[in-house]
Amino acid sequence: MAREFSLEKTRNIGIMAHVDAGKTTTTERILYYTGKIHKIGETHEGASQMDWMEQEQERGITITSAATTAQWNNHRVNIIDTPGHVDFTIEVQRSLRVLDGAVTVLDSQSGVEPQTETVWRQATEYGVPRIVFANKMDKIGADFLYSVSTLHDRLQANAHPIQLPIGSEDDFRGIIDLIKMKAEIYTNDLGTDILEEDIPAEYLDQAQEYREKLIEAVAETDEELMMKYLEGEEITNEELKAGIRKATINVEFFPVLCGSAFKNKGVQLMLDAVIDYLPSPLDIPAIKGINPDTDAEETRPASDEEPFAALAFKIMTDPFVGRLTFFRVYSGVLQSGSYVLNTSKGKRERIGRILQMHANSRQEIDTVYSGDIAAAVGLKDTTTGDSLTDEKAKIILESINVPEPVIQLMVEPKSKADQDKMGIALQKLAEEDPTFRVETNVETGETVISGMGELHLDVLVDRMRREFKVEANVGAPQVSYRETFRASTQARGFFKRQSGGKGQFGDVWIEFTPNEEGKGFEFENAIVGGVVPREFIPAVEKGLVESMANGVLAGYPMVDVKAKLYDGSYHDVDSSETAFKIAASLSLKEAAKSAQPAILEPMMLVTITVPEENLGDVMGHVTARRGRVDGMEAHGNSQIVRAYVPLAEMFGYATVLRSASQGRGTFMMVFDHYEDVPKSVQEEIIKKNKGED
């Protein structure tokens, strides 16, 4: 089958936002206007097309990124709807990794909210161009210009309106296009009848002022436009649009649009902006990767003529076709039935069928081309972040950063029959979601699951029950602590056993130093003269890695430590890998005596919104929970408090806040960083873990 849409006419976009900003409804409207669905599904009725999991429809939130393809103005738009809840950050991250552009949806009443900051930061990290859609203009308290100001104040974004609303709240009836300088007036509730008129007289001054600001902001990103602007020459609409497109693609400028997806206003104009200002696969730099045979960096430009290269960004279990692997094709062409190489795992995979997804319905296709997003059936070894390439032109593309889980729960099957089913279910769920970890406590045999938050684990336990029919008892949530060293030290690990049978001999000197936060464990071999033979070096590193899985203070994993093996000795006959592994672990234990070991706890960035009169209560809550206030701002009659609070102190806070504010207060929290626990708390944790009361 020949290519239907050229690369220039392809857009791969994500829709991202804070929970409840109206993201899924916006995607629904896009599908409605592009002819994909005939009836609009409302999220609050539990009938949305993109939210296809049972739980999503019940909870009215989006959990998995559904991928769908639509057509607009002779362009193909592949859309990924991402979750806005902080517990599902990995879904946002893996989507951003394979997108070329994104639409950030704001709630016009609240502007930038905590999770907006998180997804914005992630999009900046991946260099994703964005346009902003200020949604819910029909809502009480909607304020477009306030929303724009929050983009400047909270995100330091060079964001400027390319539209202005006509009216707001119940009176929201149209949109001013600042490029054409025309007004779009909506005459019905389906948003299909739109009249283009001159700008109403009472809005003309404001429109001229904001067009001037827009021209100035765009001119600052382009030398030619700047010269014309300074010389007082007129900048044409075409030049202005070209300037906005160039600056947006270079991530120097963010156009802001307005509308109400629920009331069907502004969505078509937003689709026009996706085509006009967001990049095609040809507009962004060619993807880079490493050739596994030569270790040299190579690029893969977006072209059907190049060798095939794709990135798997999501695994999903479909009730009808089994395991689905979603992938983005960066270069080349792939046909169903062909073989590819998974360069991340070094394994050959056969592509059974290729499906193009529309939320949860699917269409089988024979061929995918560069720039496409599709799902494959039949891949056995491929997981999130793996590269799939032509067998003759290997390349490993940059993978996806997976955040560490911060919360854990104990789960146990209710009956013996559930035992095996639970193992299979947890394994499948962990394949789909890299931030979900499953471990078995060797001593107690208990199964511990870890994830990004209470809702995250809730949803997974719920899915285990619904999809895999496993009934399980769930323990109280526990915090995922970490351990580290705060001082440098040198320590010897000496292991010798020479009585009866084969002897054992291992002797190492290791220097331990604290590593930068987030850098993890780093091992350096500084042995000279072969005092520890080369074949035993990996055993020393392995011995340290295994010992660090159970830290020296309370058995939590150790992080951010550098270990330099610089001296030691061996025995010609008795030395073995096992002996050096044990010696390395003894060296770590010895180091703990002088390296100031510390326990680290996850600190959450908590944003609490309460009525003015409850501000004092909230400040008290933060202090009582070992937190520190980072900032406050007034918004209408509410106060917004930002604070850093240990996760351990936040369990059950929803109930406390609800009763203190008579149900009017809300809070959001997102993991921010790890920090040393105070000495008194550390002693309690150690006691508890040693089984003392």
From Swiss-Prot:
Q: Which GO terms describe its cellular component?
A: cytoplasm
- Is-annotated flag, keyword Transmembrane helix? no
SUPFAM superfamilies per the UniProt record, alphabetical: EF-G C-terminal domain-like, P-loop containing nucleoside triphosphate hydrolases, Ribosomal protein S5 domain 2-like, Translation proteins
- All copies of the tr-type G domain together span 8-282
Binding positions for GTP per the UniProt entry? 17-24, 81-85, 135-138
Q: Name one GO biological process term.
A: ribosome disassembly
* GO molecular function terms listed in the Swiss-Prot or TrEMBL record: GTP binding; GTPase activity; translation elongation factor activity
The subcellular localization recorded is: Cytoplasm
Known PROSITE patterns for this protein? G_TR_1, G_TR_2
Q: What are the protein's UniProt keywords?
A: Cytoplasm, Elongation factor, GTP-binding, Nucleotide-binding, Protein biosynthesis
Pfam families (UniProt xref): EF-G_D2, EFG_C, EFG_III, EFG_IV, GTP_EFTU
Q: What does this protein do?
A: Catalyzes the GTP-dependent ribosomal translocation step during translation elongation. During this step, the ribosome changes from the pre-translocational (PRE) to the post-translocational (POST) state as the newly formed A-site-bound peptidyl-tRNA and P-site-bound deacylated tRNA move to the P and E sites, respectively. Catalyzes the coordinated movement of the two tRNA molecules, the mRNA and conformational changes in the ribosome.
Q: Quote the PANTHER family the UniProt record gives.
A: RIBOSOME-RELEASING FACTOR 2, MITOCHONDRIAL, TRANSLATION ELONGATION FACTOR G-RELATED
In which family does this protein belong, per the annotation?
Belongs to the TRAFAC class translation factor GTPase superfamily. Classic translation factor GTPase family. EF-G/EF-2 subfamily.
Name of the protein in its database record = Elongation factor G
Q: Which organism is it from?
A: Streptococcus pneumoniae (strain JJA)
> Which gene codes for it?
fusA
